[in-house]
Amino acid sequence: MERIKELRNLMSQSRTREILTKTTVDHMAIIKKYTSGRQEKNPSLRMKWMMAMKYPITADKRITEMVPERNEQGQTLWSKMSDAGSDRVMVSPLAVTWWNRNGPMTSTVHYPKVYKTYFDKVERLKHGTFGPVHFRNQVKIRRRVDINPGHADLSAKEAQDVIMEVVFPNEVGARILTSESQLTITKEKKEELQDCKISPLMVAYMLERELVRKTRFLPVAGGTSSVYIEVLHLTQGTCWEQMYTPGGEVRNDDVDQSLIIAARNIVRRAAVSADPLASLLEMCHSTQIGGTRMVDILRQNPTEEQAVDICKAAMGLRISSSFSFGGFTFKRTSGSSIKREEEVLTGNLQTLKIRVHEGYEEFTMVGKRATAIIRKATRRLVQLIVSGRDEQSIAEAIIVAMVFSQEDCMIKAVRGDLNFVNRANQRLNPMHQLLRHFQKDAKVLFQNWGIEHIDNVMGMIGVLPDMTPSTEMSMRGIRVSKMGVDEYSSTERVVVSIDRFLRVRDQRGNVLLSPEEVSETQGTEKLTITYSSSMMWEINGPESVLVNTYQWIIRNWETVKIQWSQNPTMLYNKMEFEPFQSLVPKAIRGQYSGFVRTLFQQMRDVLGTFDTTQIIKLLPFAAAPPKQSRMQFSSLTVNVRGSGMRILVRGNSPVFNYNKTTKRLTILGKDAGTLIEDPDEGTSGVESAVLRGFLILGKEDRRYGPALSINELSNLAKGEKANVLIGQGDVVLVMKRKRDSSILTDSQTATKRIRMAIN
């Protein structure tokens, strides 16, 4: 208290006030400010002042032997005085000019390799086309964008390890190169940069540009891929835009684009399967994008999109804490709420159970073509300020906000029943029911909302129920603004959980994402997406399912054959046969399955009736739950090419055609690969040749484990016994001979012994 009184007393004297406000500060403080610390306080002044001196540069002593004292014009290039405090020479800027013109030439072979990002940029600009300049108001919103075209997607730590390994291989320090991409890049760069004379620091800096994604939070009105961002200063100002088409694409943009397409396809497909989460993981792990495993890309790529984030959540990765509704990203900026279940009645007197958010909250809403600020109380929209590219985009944002508000007049505006279903034919949750309903037709919603007189506010304008702008009236609480709303800038990621049905929740239990939020937009991927999972075979239609199913059987024939004879039920239940079922007419699936299973059982029972091509051809039909009936079929129908096509049980058809001489299988006229029939089909006694070096001991003996295929026999040690599957699907017990001398006689005895063992 005493101190404060003293200060007040001092301040009351006018002289004190004058001293503190008018006089210059003690000079020592200023000197300190500009001399303490290594950081240059006024770099441009320092530069101008230095360059005004005669010899502002210092160089190594060796320079005096390589650069003459004077140039052709007689100007002095370096001083005989040495630099104070070091053993370097003082040099004039003219020496640099001389060096650039007359200095030694080094090999330039490494320049395009080290400065690759710059050379590539020049190429893109050279081939790019600049269109006309348009003058108009630019609605820019800040988005997190990639500013560095042509980079790989390594984390800073991974890149650091690669750079150290490439540039300073002998430096001490633990470096762990684990990921596929790290190893590939390291190998590639080491080869490229052999005998490179460019300074290691420069090489390291340029490598970093090539390996790491750099993002900035920038105001953007147009394209956000990195090849547009690198020319942002040329394409959009405050009141103008210049049309531009990039002169080349870069892999990082292609990866981002293809990743989104793959993720959307996978989430859509997983949502309709019996166990969506397991299916999604299986597909993510077996998919490649441009030759890189999708899971590796997901771990490194920061793209935020609904489907991509669902895949990341499934893999246990952190994602952004914002949530998605109606294709917009919502981020709460203030307020809080508690959730409570409430039953409401629609205009059609249908009861809906909705989770009401009680409390005042503010959100930003960011979509592809519109953005908004929304303020809401319990089941009431207080204010919505929206901006967008066009009337349509603004309307979409308004509908989403109105549904999100959960207002009663919105629920009462429902006409007709709400019974929207998702791809798996399950009813959507009430909020998405409402959203779908009004996205189809929002006329009643807008009419019933109510309108109000508005004040004239700079940059804001009203909007009427028919979406026409107005300066006098507007739909209640809703205004259109010229200014966009910035995207949420934080890169913070949170731990989330995901349930079986792919609903992603934060740790408080709020739903952030669900499959309903995944866009239905179809696009063509820039990079090849290879879905190895059988679940994705149907993405290219029924023909692809047919070809892929048969190719899978042929590729795995050795194991399929063993399962066919020993554990058929397990084989019939394989998920690879699931897509095929959609091609078989529903009414007859069960009968086909029963018929084929019976046929296969006869093949197992009756010697000499094993038929490779027939098993392969009919196997997919046996996967459906069988119906027992006495029906026999000579052909089976599959729905491809828009109609039913027949597969003949015995013999070839346009759908399934096997050429015995060429051993090629064609499905619907497309080559499906080589099919090697079992040796004994048609020619007896050949299996003996296969079994040379083995002694046949008799019938199958279960104590020696499951039957091996003939290929697997080579792994047996001498004297070891094993069951083996021979041609007809029969299993015999064999022993690998202890001596090689007797191999010749095996061929003759084998044939007899097989006959005996089987009979």
Swiss-Prot record:
Gene3D superfamilies with a match to the protein in the record: Polymerase Basic Protein 2, C-terminal domain (3.30.30.90)
Motif Nuclear localization signal in this chain: 736-739
Subcellular location: Virion; Host nucleus; Host mitochondrion
Protein's UniProt keywords contain Membrane: no
GO cellular component: host cell mitochondrion; host cell nucleus; virion component
Biological process terms in GO annotation: 7-methylguanosine mRNA capping; cap snatching; DNA-templated transcription; symbiont-mediated suppression of host cytoplasmic pattern recognition receptor signaling pathway via inhibition of MAVS activity; symbiont-mediated suppression of host gene expression; symbiont-mediated suppression of host mRNA transcription via inhibition of RNA polymerase II activity; viral RNA genome replication
Residues the UniProt record annotates as site (Mammalian adaptation): 627
The keyword Metal-binding is assigned to this record: no
Record-level Gene Ontology MF annotations: RNA binding; RNA-directed RNA polymerase activity
Primary localisation category: virion
Keywords: Cap snatching, Eukaryotic host gene expression shutoff by virus, Eukaryotic host transcription shutoff by virus, Host gene expression shutoff by virus, Host mitochondrion, Host nucleus, Host-virus interaction, Inhibition of host innate immune response by virus, Inhibition of host MAVS by virus, Inhibition of host RLR pathway by virus, Inhibition of host RNA polymerase II by virus, mRNA capping, mRNA processing, Viral immunoevasion, Viral transcription, Virion
Subunit structure: Influenza RNA polymerase is composed of three subunits: PB1, PB2 and PA. Interacts (via N-terminus) with PB1 (via C-terminus). Interacts with nucleoprotein NP (via N-terminus). Interacts (via N-terminus) with host MAVS (via N-terminus); this interaction inhibits host innate immune response.
Function: Plays an essential role in transcription initiation and cap-stealing mechanism, in which cellular capped pre-mRNAs are used to generate primers for viral transcription. Recognizes and binds the 7-methylguanosine-containing cap of the target pre-RNA which is subsequently cleaved after 10-13 nucleotides by the viral protein PA. Plays a role in the initiation of the viral genome replication and modulates the activity of the ribonucleoprotein (RNP) complex.
Family: Belongs to the influenza viruses PB2 family.
Protein name: Polymerase basic protein 2
Biological source species: Influenza A virus (strain A/Qu/7/1970 H3N2)
